[in-house]
C-alpha cells in the first residue's frame, strides 16, 4: 500500500495517472492528457499489456501461429500510446531540471522503465519474426519486467485520505517487523542447517544389486522401491540378500542425478530445512534419515524442526501481519467506512404485528403498495408462510440435486427424473420472481441485493434447463440455490455477514491475490519458457497452475525440483532462491493477510466493547443465581425440615417444634472450641478437685459470650454482609494488583507521560469537586463555557459508568448470596439433600474422613500477614507443581500414566488378553480407580449433591472410562472378530489417556477453551459443508462416469480395454536417471481394467464430498486437477482451482480466525478495547522484565575500569558476535575423521575458543568474579567456554570421532548466544519461549489425544496390508509407529492416501471371521470417521490454538518507540537507574531511596519538581503506604510508574479501576493533609516572626511568664539564656534526633516520631528565636519519658499561643491561632519546626 511521492509542484503541475482525475496543465497542446477517459484508457491498457506477454512463448506460437502477429500489433499500439504519454510528461515537467522533473519522480521513472521494456520487447519480437533471434533463446528473459506494468492499473487505489507521514510510519514499522521475523526465521534455518550437516551429511548410500559397477548405475540396478541404507552394521537399514549398500556418488552419479535435497553442505542443508519446514515432503526425508542413520537422531531432528520452525517460528509471521493490520485498521477506517446495513433497502424500520399475533421488524414503507398486484397477493408475498414455503422448496431442490448419481453408460441422461424435477423447480422459482416483481415493481425488486442474486439464479437456471445447456457450466446456477438456505438461520446469516463484512476488504484482497498470481505467472513464464525438458512453464495456463500450486503448498517441492533439474547445476541456486522467496511471501504473508482480514471483521467496534463488558458481567451475575437442574429437582418435593429431638424427656412435657438448624447456631458451632452446653453444666459438680468454682464460672462466661456472639452474628448478618463483601472485593482487587506488578514504557518526548497523566487526573478531580455547583463566573468567554460544559458532560458519563460498575458488583454479590441461600434452604428443608447416595449423612465421620482424603493437597505457600502477598520460597515452583492437584489425583495420574505405558506395549501380535504381564497394569488401574471413585462419591456424592462426581462432562467421562475398563477386565474376550462389539469395546478402552484431562485443572481449561467456541466452529463447518455441497453437486452432474478410464494409457475406448499389458514401476522420486538406449524401466504384466481413479470419483454426492473434503485440506488436489484436465477437458480445470482458492484462502483461514477469536474471548481479551489490551500486554511484559545483572563500573580509573570500558563498548560486542558467526561457519561441512578438510577447520575452532577464553577473562577482571556471575548470559558463556577448553584438551589428546562431535556441539551451543546479543532476536525468542510455556498444556492435550488415536489405530488398522503409503515406516503395527504416523498426519503429509490404504476391502485383501489380528483388511467406515475426525480436531482446531497463543504473546512484545505506553527504551532507562540506586544488586531497595530513584529518571518517566511536585509526593507516599516503609522491589516501583503513566479510565477494567481510584483518592487525601499541615506551620512561623518585631511587650510578658514557670518547676536554678546559647541549644537538640527526614512518612506524625528543629536555609535572614520563646528550659535531670516531654512541650506552646492571642490586637490573627490550636489538639502529634519545603525538596 504505497502512496507515491508527491512533488512540490503537484498543485501547479500534477501528472496523469497520479491521482483520481488530476489534470496536468491548462495548455492547449497537452489538453488531451488531462481528460478522465485518457486516465481510464491508460489503466485499461496497462492490463491489456500483460496479455501479449502471457501469449509470447514459443509453445503458444507453435500451437497458434497467428498470435505472433496479434501480440506484435498490440505491443505496437501500446508502445505508441505510452511513448506519447511519456513525452507529454517530459514536456510538462521537464526531464532533469526543476523540483518535479520527470527523473525526480519515482512513479515517472517506473513508467519510463516500463516504456523502455516495451520497446525492448517489441524490437526483440521483430528479430524473432525475422529469424535473427531464435525463439527458444534466453533473450526472451528481457520480457521479465513487463508484467509489472499491471501496477499502473491498481496504484490509483493506493491513494488514501491520510497524512503521508502516518502511512510512511505504519509501513516502515510493519516492514521492520517483517524484516525482524525474517531474520529470526533465517536464524533457525541456519541453526537446523548446521545441525543437519553435522548429524546426517549426505544421503548417497542406496541398496543396489551385487553386480553393479561404477558408471553403470541404471533403474534396474536399484531396489524396488529405491531404499537408502547405512554402511554401518549397527545403525540404519541393512540391505536384503542379493543387494549391497553402496555410495552412488562413488559409483559415478552426478549431483544433478542424485537430487538437490540433502545435508551435504550448509547451502543445500538450509534449502532442505526450508523444504521440510513447509511440511511438504519432510516425512520422506525423515524416512531416508532413519534408513541411513540412527533412528533416535532422525526422530529428534525432524520432530523438533516441525515443532519449532513450522508451528512456532512461521506462525510469528501471522502474528506480525495481524498486529500490523489491527493498527492499520484504525487508520484506514475512513477508507473502508463503517459497515452498511444487511439489506440495501430502507434503513428505517418499525415493529409490525403479523397475522399470527407476533411482531416483526419491517421497513416503514413496507405496507405501501409499490407494484400493480392486488393487495391480497402483496400480503401473501410478505407473509412468513410464503417465505418458509419458498425456502422449503429450495431445500427439496437441493436434496433432489444431491440425490443424483451415475447410473451407467447405457442410461439416457437427458430426460431422466432429475431433469424433470429441475424443470419443475425452475418454473416454480421463475413464478416466484415474477410474483415479487409484480408486487414490488421492478425498481423496488431490483433495489435489494438479495433479489438481484435471486434474479441472477432465475435467469441462469432457466437457460440451464435448455437441453443443449444441461450438464454444462450453467449447472453452477442450479447448485447455487443452496446459498438461499442461509436465510433459514438468523445466527448463520449474521455470522456470514460478520465474517465477510464490507466486501471491499476481502474483495480487494482477492483481487490483489489474483493480480499477484497473474504477474508472477507471467514473470515465471518468460523466465522458463525456453528451458528444454520443462513443460510446466511452456504456456500461460501451465505457468498459472504451477504458481497456484506453489501458493497452496501442495507439491510445490516437485515444481521446484523439476525446474532445478531442467535449468542445470549452474542456475539452480538462483532459481531455488526465486521459488523460496515467492513461496515465503505467498504462504506466510499473503495467507496471513486473509487471517487478519477475517479477524478484523470479527472484531467489535471500540464503542461497543465497554458496553459488551458490562452486559457480560450482568449475564455472569444472572447465571450464578440459579442452581443446577440436578439440584433444583429437590424443589419439586415437599419440605421436610429436621426438627430437634430429645431422647430423654418425661412425657408430661411437650417440646415445641424447633428446627435442628436453628439450634445448631448455638450448639454445633462451639463444639470445636468447648464442650457442649448440656454436658458442661452437669459436669461442674464432679470437677471440683482443686478449684471448684473457677472452672465452672469461666466456662459459663465463655459459653455466655459465645452465645451472645452467635446471636449477634445472626442479627447483624444482613446489615454487615453487603459492606463486608464490597470491602473484600476491593481488598482482593488491590492485592491482585499488588501481586501482578508489571506494566509498560515509550520514547522520549518533551513532556513526561507521568506528568501528562497526572494532569489528566487532576482535571477529573476538579470536575468531580466542581460538579456539585454549576456556577458560572461572568468573565468567562463562550469558548471557555463550552469547554467547561463538555468537561462536565464527560465527567457525568464517567460517573454514570462508575455507578454501573458498582451496580454490577452488587448484583454479583447478591447472586452469590442468593445461590448460597437456595442451597441452605434445600439443605435445611430436604433431609436427603447433600447426602451421598442418599445414605451417608452430611456430617458423618466416614464422610468427613473421605473428604479429608479426597481434598488433601500439598500447600507450602506462606503469606505476608500485612499485605496478604504470597512469599516466594526457594523451591516455590516445585511446591506449586506439587500443590497443583490433590494427593489422590496425583496417585491416579501416576496410575493412569503407568497404565498408558503398559498399553503402548500392546500390538495385534502381543495382546493384553494373552499376555499376563500386560494385565497387571489393567488390574491396578481398575482397582485404584474403584477406590478413587468410591472415596469421591462418599465425600461429594454421585449426582444429586452440590459437588457431585457427575456434575459435568468430565464426571460422565470418568464413569464411562471406568465402566469400559471394568467390563473389559471382567470379560477379557479371547477371540475378537473384526467390526464386532468386542473390538468396539477395545476401541473405547483406548480413551483411557483422556482421564488426565479431568484430573489436571489446566487440561480442563484447554477443553473448555475448545468447546466454548463450538458455536462459531460449527457455523464455519456449515459454511464449508455448503461450499462442498455446491461443488459436489456440480461435480456429480458434470463428471459422473467421465473420470473412469482404462489403466492402459494407449487404450481410449472401453470396448478395447481387455487383455494384459506391461506397466512400469516407479522406483524413486528423488533420483533423476535417464534411460539408456535399449533400456526399459522395471515393470510387470497386469490386466487391463476400466475404472475410476483409486482415491476419488464423482459418481455420487457422497464420494464427491469425500474427494472435496480431501481437497479442502489441500492434499491430493493436484491429482484431481490432472485427472479432470486429462479426462474431461482443460476448461474444467477452472472448477477445481476455484474450489481450492475459496477453500484455501477463505475456508481454512476462517478456522484460523475463528479459533483465534474464541481464544481471545476465553482469555477475556476479545471485549477489551485497544487501550485495555495494551495495558494487559504491558503488565505481562513487565512481569518478564528483570533488573540488569550488570555490576557497576569500578570507581577508579585503573586497569579494571579500562577493561570494563572495553568489554562494554558496542564495537567489542559486535566483534564478539561476528566471531561467533565466523566460528559457526566452520560447521558448513560435516566434521568427519576421514575427511582431510576437518583438521584445519577444527584447528581454526581452537583459535576461536582461545579468543572466547580471553573475552571471558577480560569480563571477569572488569566485573570481578561475583559481578560476572550475576548475569545468566555470562554464566552461559562461561559454561560454553569451559566446555570449549575441555574439548581442546580432548581434541589434541584423542583426535577421534567423539571429539569432533563434541567440538561441533560446543560451536552449536555458542551459536545460541547470538540471540542474547541481538535485541530483535532476543525479543522474538522470548515470544517463542513464552508461547511454549503458555501452550504447554495445549501441547500435552494434543499428545494425549494423539495417544488415544494411536491406541485405537493399533486395534483398527494394526494388520492392514501395505499399500501406497502404508509401508514398513508408516503403519499401525505398534503404538510407537502409530504415533509417528499420526504426527505425520497432523502436518497433513498425504493423510488422505493413508486413509484410503486403511479402507482396503475384499477382494483386495484376505478377511477373517474370528479374529481381527488374522486379517489384513481395513475398515471403511472406521477409517473414514477415524482420519477425518482426527485431522479436523488436530489440524484445524488444536494447531490453531498454538497460533492464537503466539499472536497473543507477540502482541506482548510488539513495542516500538511510537507506543503510547512504556517502550523498551523507557524500560532500559529504568533498569539502568535502578542499578545506580540498588548498589548491592539485591533487587530491593529501602523505601526512602525511591525518591532518589524518581529524581534520577529522565525522558518520559521524568518528574519535574518545579511543575509536578505534588505528583512526586503522591508517588513516594504510594510506595510507603503499600509497603509500610519497608523494602520495595524492582517490580513494585515499575508497577507504580506504569499505573501513573496510563489513563486508568481508558486502560483499566471494572474492578481494577475501582480499586486503583480508591487507592489514588486515599493517597490524595493523605498527601493533602500533610501539605496543609506543612503550610500551616510555615504560616505560623511567619506570623510569629512579625509579632517578634512589632510587639516588644509580648516579649517581656513572655520572659516574665518563663521566669514564673521556671521558678515553679525548678526554683534553685534560673538562668538567662543568650542568643549565642540559643544556637548551640538548637544544634544540640538537633543532634540528639535521628535523621529520619528521608524515611519520614507522609502520614500524620505519631508519638514515635521525635520532632526535631533545625536551621532552615530559607530562614537565615529572619530573626533567630530563643529557646525560651518556644520551649521551657530543661531541668538538671533530663526527663526520660517521651510522652511527658511531649506533653510539656505542647503545653508550653499552647501557653505562649494564648498569650500571643490575648496581646494581639488583630482579631483575625487570634481566630487563626485558636483554630490552629484546635487542629493540633485533634491530631495529637508532635509539631516539628521544619517547614514544608524541607519535605518537598529532597
UniProtKB/Swiss-Prot annotation:
Voltage-gated ion channel responsible for the resting Na(+) permeability that controls neuronal excitability. NALCN channel functions as a multi-protein complex, which consists at least of NALCN, NALF1, UNC79 and UNC80. NALCN is the voltage-sensing, pore-forming subunit of the NALCN channel complex. NALCN channel complex is constitutively active and conducts monovalent cations but is blocked by physiological concentrations of extracellular divalent cations. The chain crosses the membrane at residues 37-57, 66-90, 107-129, 138-158, 174-199, 295-322, 383-403, 417-439, 448-468, 473-492, 503-530, 570-599, 887-906, 916-939, 948-972, 981-1003, 1016-1039, 1130-1159, 1211-1227, 1237-1260, 1272-1293, 1297-1318, 1332-1357, 1421-1447. It is found in: Cell membrane. Glycans are attached at residues 210, 216, 1064. Residues 270-289, 544-563, 1105-1124, 1379-1398 dip into the membrane without crossing it. Gene3D superfamilies: 1.10.287.70, EF-hand, Voltage-gated potassium channels. Chain C. This is Sodium leak channel NALCN. The lineage of its organism: Eukaryota, Metazoa, Chordata, Craniata, Vertebrata. Residues 1633-1648 have a biased composition (Low complexity). Found in a complex with NALCN, UNC79, UNC80 and NACL1; these auxiliary subunits are indispensable for the function of NALCN channel. Interacts with UNC80; required for the NALCN activation/inhibition by GPCRs in neurons. Found in a complex with NALCN, UNC79 and UNC80; UNC80 bridges NALCN to UNC79. Interacts with CHRM3. Disulfide bonds join 207-239, 229-245, 1046-1057, 1405-1417. GO terms for cellular component: monoatomic ion channel complex; plasma membrane. Phosphorylated on tyrosine residues. It is a multi-pass membrane protein. GO terms for molecular function: leak channel activity; monoatomic cation channel activity; voltage-gated sodium channel activity. InterPro entries: Ion_trans_dom, NALCN, Volt_channel_dom_sf. It comes from Rattus norvegicus (Rat). Residues 762-789, 1611-1679 are annotated as: Disordered. Residues 795-830 form a coiled coil. Residues 1-36, 91-106, 159-173, 323-382, 440-447, 493-502, 600-886, 940-947, 1004-1015, 1160-1210, 1261-1271, 1319-1331, 1448-1738 are cytoplasmic. Residues 1613-1631 have a biased composition (Polar residues). Belongs to the NALCN family. The keyword Ion transport applies. It comes from the Eukaryota. PANTHER family: SODIUM LEAK CHANNEL NALCN (PTHR46141:SF1), SODIUM LEAK CHANNEL NON-SELECTIVE PROTEIN (PTHR46141). Residues 58-65, 130-137, 200-269, 290-294, 404-416, 469-472, 531-543, 564-569, 907-915, 973-980, 1040-1104, 1125-1129, 1228-1236, 1294-1296, 1358-1378, 1399-1420 are extracellular. Keywords: Cell membrane, Coiled coil, Disulfide bond, Glycoprotein, Ion channel, Ion transport, Membrane, Phosphoprotein, Repeat, Sodium, Sodium channel, Sodium transport, Transmembrane, Transmembrane helix, Transport, Voltage-gated channel.
